Amino acid sequence: MSALLTPLAQLDINSRRGGTCVSENGFCPEWIVDNLDRYVEPLLQHIALTTVAVAAGFAISFALALLAHHRRWLTAPITAATSVIYTIPSVALFLILVPVTGLSFWTAIIALVAYTQVFLFRNMINGLVNVPEEVKDAAHGMGLTDRQVLWRVEMPLAVPEILAGLRIATTSTVNLATLAFFAGAGGLGAQIFQDITFRSNVVVAGGLAILLAVQYDLAILRVQRRMTPWRRAAAT
């Protein structure tokens, strides 16, 4: 219980100052305009949490996927392990880590990275495995080595599935990062809990999280379209 209360005790509860709309706990555009600056730092913290966690998670899952691709027997245990981690309630995982690594940005990152693995690893290994054997045989017939086939044939063909997993992992991380305040990492979740009963505050902080998830998703989608020009050509 003390681990749960510590992050809450560190929150600087915001006082509400405004007219009738604020006192009646309505949706107050004027209050929002006057207080937008208080959301800048939490938003930047949220972006940092998401970007670092997804980047680290991608690097780890990429290495695991390459390892499992060459040693197929590893696929099942790695998939099972990532699935088990994802079943752990997010708040519980943050609180489990706090006594070990303390209240910090990196405590939140460890938890968020762990949650990305179930999407990233599964999509990466599926993308590599689903490359048709006849395509790889044709590449070998042209004189390409196994390493060249991996990077010139298998990896490009796996890109759509890999980036699909990245989109899901990123959106999920934006969502889970709202709970990073339990690890003392701030973010939009901390802003929400500063005044969770005030509708305007919750709407703005929650809306920013949704907007952030949409922007990440659109950015990855644009990258996917640039990396898979053959799909655009087929669509036209």
What positions do the PLM features span?
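Loop-to-helix entry region at the N-terminal start of transmembrane alpha-helices
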Residues: 38-49, 95-119, 201-205, 209
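Short cytosolic juxtamembrane segments of multi-pass membrane proteins
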Residues: 224-236
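Membrane-embedded alpha-helices of multi-pass transport/permease systems
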Residues: 59-64, 107-136, 159, 163-174, ...
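Hydrophobic alpha-helical transmembrane segments of polytopic membrane proteins
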Residues: 188-224
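Short helix-to-coil transition segments within interhelical loops
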Residues: 128-158, 185
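Periplasmic/extracellular loop-to-transmembrane helix junction in inner-membrane transport proteins
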Residues: 4-53
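Transmembrane alpha-helices
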Residues: 51, 114, 146-179, 210-211
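Cytoplasmic-entry segments and transmembrane alpha-helices of multi-pass inner-membrane transporters
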Residues: 64-97, 122-126, 130
